[in-house]
Structure formats: structure tokens, C-alpha cells
Regions:
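ATP-dependent carboxylate-amine ligase
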Residues: 6, 10, 16-189
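Internal nucleotide-binding/catalytic subdomain
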Residues: 2-4
Length: 189
């Protein structure tokens, strides 16, 4: 519910994440300030649909894929990990490098490994030199961990890794090409 001076808007946000609640509240505040009818604000919030590769929730025959492969930064990756860990089934994280982070890149990636441990991920699959830092954290904590240099190697490993009922997050900067992995999962699981 969005409560404002003149009333209440009850709307359901069709995508997960506290950050989406914040975005919806901001949009509603702007709309109300501009005099947009509350019913139109409700319709706008409830008709939201993510674009390809931006936290698309895809139910395949065997599992749930969270395709967030288009881009990544430390804040968006932490939010995506939280969403994945709250879903049903085993949590499988397929995370690629977050690019253009400068001197703190290794630290930011280590923090993603710690986040995966904190939220109780079951499997961590990393891609890229920076994501090795996250994989070291998850492996140290006893989480089943794999690291690969190519998307093709990840795809080969998935056949022996994924199970019915899993929730699989695919998240990375666009330049790591994890979109190919998301497409493989859609087509084969």
C-alpha cells in the first residue's frame, strides 16, 4: 500500500526485490506530485515488465531461472543474490565478473562471495578472473563451488549440476557474455 495525504493506492509489484518497492514508491510520489490519477499510478506499477536480461523470472520445465545477465554492479548483484536465496529449491548462483570497478574490484567480488555464504546459497559457479575472489569465499565456507573461464565450460558443467526445482540466478556485467548461459538453461532445462 502507498499511503499519501489524500488516500491510499494498493498495488502489487510484479517483480521481486526491496529495490523494486523503492522504485515504485518514487514513481508514485512523482506521479502524485504531477497530479496523475492514483488508478493510473496503480496500473503503471502493476504493468511493469523487465526487459530481457534484467531480472526476468522464467519458469522452465525443471527449474526457475532468474535471468539478470544484462549488467551488474555490487548493489544490483547483492540484491539479486538476496532474491535468489529467498526462492524455493536449491539456490544456484552463476555469477560473472562485474566490470569497470577499478582498484576495489577484487574486494567487491569477495564481498559477493560473502553475500552468497550469508544468504545460504547451495552452489556457486563463477566466471572470470575477478569472480575467483568470490569463489574463494564460498569454497572456504563449504559451499559447492566451481570456477570457469568460458561460458561453454559452465554449460557443460550444468548438465551434472542442476536439478529439478532449483532456483538459478545468472548475473554478470554484459561484457562477460553470461547471456549465453541463460539461453542454454532456457533451452535445455
Amino acid at each position: 500500500d502507498i499511503v499519501y495525504g489524500g488516500g491510499r493506492i494498493t498495488a502489487t509489484i510484479p517483480t521481486p526485490g526491496i529495490h523494486m518497492v523503492m522504485h515504485s514508491l518514487c514513481a508514485a510520489a512523482v506521479g502524485l506530485t504531477l497530479g496523475i490519477e492514483p488508478e493510473l499510478i496503480k496500473q503503471g506499477i502493476e504493468s511493469y515488465a523487465p526487459v530481457e536480461g534484467r531480472m526476468q523470472i522464467i519458469k522452465t520445465q525443471r527449474l526457475t531461472l532468474l535471468d539478470d545477465s544484462f549488467n551488474a554492479n555490487p548493489t544490483s548483484m547483492a540484491a539479486a543474490i538476496n532474491i535468489a536465496c529467498r526462492a524455493s529449491g536449491r539456490t544456484v548462483l552463476i555469477l560473472g565478473d562485474m566490470l569497470e570497478l577499478g582498484e576495489k574490484g577484487a574486494e567487491y567480488h569477495r564481498n559477493m562471495g560473502k553475500k552468497a555464504v550469508e544468504c545460504g546459497a547451495d552452489i556457486m559457479i563463477g566466471k572470470g578472473p575477478l569472480m575467483k575472489n568470490a569463489c574463494e569465499e564460498t569454497e572456504r565456507a563449504g559451499i559447492e563451488t566451481m570456477h570457469f573461464d568460458t561460458s561453454e565450460d559452465i554449460m557443460r558443467a550444468l548438465d551434472n549440476c542442476l536439478r529439478d526445482g532449483d532456483t538459478v540466478l545468472v548475473k554478470a556485467s554484459h561484457g562477460t557474455n553470461l547471456k549465453d548461459v541463460a539461453e542454454y538453461i532456457k533451452a535445455n532445462f
